[in-house]
Amino acid sequence: MKTSLSILTVLLNCLPAAGVESFAAHWEFVGVAVSEPGYHVWGSSPILDAEGKVHLFVARWPRQYRVDPGWRSHSEIAHYVADGPEGPFRFCEVALAGTGRDTWDKYGAHNPAIHKVGDRYVLLYIANDDPRRPAHPANQRIGMALSTSLHGPWRKAGADGMILAPPSDSKYWNYRASNGVNNPAFLQHPDGGFFLYFKSQGGKMGLAVAQQLEGPYVQLPFPVTRNDRAVEDGYAFIMDGKFRLLTTDNHGLFKAGGGILWTSDDGIHFDRAEPGFDLIEAYVGKEKLKNAVRHYGGKIKFERPQLLLIDGRPKYLYAPSGYNIFGGDSTVSYVLRFNEQ
């Protein structure tokens, strides 16, 4: 009861003031970001290069494998590029794939997050060593690869690329987590060091910190979000001097199938929240969904939100969906534009 009341207090105190639009109200649907014939497409993480081109690192796998378990068994991370944020995006090369060997990342390189630190590009991803486990399995881990070029080659951090696994301390909140650690969100702290956010037990968001880019990453013993219903797929950034974490809202803290923008003063305690994005229908209208084809999931919603920041401000949102709203035979990722007004 105490936990439920504290969550309710957070949500009631953190809705935008009267007359102030939520983060979710600023998004405008543009269209498809990546559609690849013969492939399902999922998490699509953007980065801007020095020439103004936008690169997307995209989880994809052959269409003959269903979304689940295809993402666990056959996902790879492909690199696409466009002259601007709205595309069209062109395939360049496969950046990472499962090793196929007896390693922690034998299968399913998935849900990338791309960043730049100094003169190096940092590609975070998840993978597993046995796709026959149940959905959202305990053998998920987080890896890191680095390169001085967005076209690679990519060198795995440390001995084998793995930078985070579930804790071995039984007092930690996600000890023996049924879903491992997954879906990384990365932030270079303005005072030095690095923050690695992740989803784990109970659909809560956790945090691991490191002094050096390649680690070691040390997990905090408590979750950083206060939620009694699952969230996931965080994207971390700093805006107006505050730490922000954009996640999905799986079961309706605000609206089931929408998103949440969490806010924190220190990046550790996310005690304020507001709607981060809405269901797809809110941006395209019901009529545009009449030909939508379901490939995964229940609601027609966005998944794995990833932001493109320009001059430190969110400008574009890239997100896949279990539904192809245009009726195609595989999933695609979509792009939305942020309107400041």
Feature-to-residue mapping (PLM):
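Positively charged n-region of N-terminal signal peptides that target proteins for export
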Residues: M1-S4
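Carbohydrate-active catalytic/glycan-binding domains of CAZyme proteins
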Residues: A18-Q341
